[in-house]
Amino acid sequence: MKEEQFFFNDTNYSIKIGKNKTENDHLVKTSAKTDIWFHVNNTSSSHVVLLNNEKLNKIPKQVIKRCACLCKSNSSSKSELKCEIIYTEMANVSATEHEGQVTVNGLSKIIVI
């Protein structure tokens, strides 16, 4: 699993990136309900998790965009001109019986160009 630190406006953000279904599954099962989960919409991709204890609407848009870009760059969609990334609080993400697969409610969306 890859981890990255991101500084924005004097705040340090921690980001985790699952590189395969086992790591993705581990992220889903161990992340806090307030962490923010990112995934390429309607295709397989890495799971990106922003460690967080704030409300989603309090996170700067630049931080959300950074996580979405990491999600795109770690997916099979990395060479596409436009890529739709879904993101939501981990409280809305549930593991299924299939390793690395999830069900999601309460989506927000961002288009990465």
Where do the language-model regions lie?
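Duplex nucleic acid-engaging cores and interfaces of nucleic-acid transaction enzymes
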Residues: 1-113
